[in-house]
């Protein structure tokens, strides 16, 4: 169960826009091994934990700490059971470091999803446009 304070989401977008272009330059696949995937289907893993993704690309440095302040103002509550059930994937263990707010992370193997993602407001305000990821 997660509770997000939506009035703080714009501040999180600003904080994210300061991090993404600094750590992502150009089109690449990401090592998501330490990032909670909320969608456990083997062929459609689309929803990843935003906090763990930012932590991973920054290696948990001072940029992450600054970003995390904005994140904590959005995610005011998050609790999960140790295991969850998916009709598609059965029982799975929750990553205890996950913080409950998911995001789509572009991948080179999903060009149509990436194109659709470019149309979202989050893409436009969170800094993805400044990473060079979508340039041909």
Question: PLM features: residue spans?
Answer:
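Terminal, contiguous helix-loop blocks that mediate binding/assembly
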Residues: 1-136
